[in-house]
A protein has these predicted regions:
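Catalytic nucleophile loop
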Residues: 1-16
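Amide-donor transfer/coupling interface in amidating biosynthetic enzymes
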Residues: 18-160
């Protein structure tokens, strides 16, 4: 699985429902009254009435954890990726996710924002909050796309 932006958010919701047993887990974008809002508005936007121009937009740094798919793909501990979103992983759920095996392999340098989530034990299970497609080119694929295709080919070969 490789989820980009909303794809990472959906992976986080699926983990909450399937692994944590939070049947009503959701994003406040889709279910504002969810008892388990694992995806929510960025904290600095919670009290805003007018959302115009409030996205997290542009390039931001991301710190990568060692021994992760992210580190395997990038080969370095600090990267910069482009964003376009206003919803993010709700840190109130971070500890319970980690207790149940989720790995937050990419974070803002200060550790407050989840940038990437992995689930070990799969050939490839990675969700990223940013948009790697913005930095990928036909003659120079983004490192995560390369790793995803490589993992898919390895699974295909193993199952042939």
């Amino acid at each position: 699985y490789f989820g980009i932006c909303l794809g990472m958010q959906i992976a986080a919701i699926a983990f909450a429902r399937g692994v944590l047993g939070y049947e009503d887990a959701n994003s406040t974008e889709f279910a504002p009254d969810s008892k388990h809002p694992v995806i929510a508005l960025m904290e600095e936007q919670m009290d805003l009435a007018d959302m115009g121009g409030t996205m997290r937009l542009g390039a931001y740094p991301c710190r990568i954890s060692p021994d992760t798919l992210m580190m395997k793909a990038y080969g370095k501990g600090l990267i910069e990726e482009r964003h376009r979103h206003r919803y993010e992983f709700n840190n109130k759920f971070r500890e319970v996710y980690m207790e149940h095996g989720a790995i937050f392999s990419g974070q803002s340098p200060d550790g407050t924002l989840v940038e990437a989530m992995e689930i070990p034990g799969h050939p490839f299970y990675l969700g990223v909050q940013y948009h790697p497609e913005f930095k990928s080119r036909p003659n120079r694929a983004h490192p995560i796309f390369r790793e995803f295709v490589k993992a898919a080919l390895e699974v295909k070969e193993k199952n042939s």
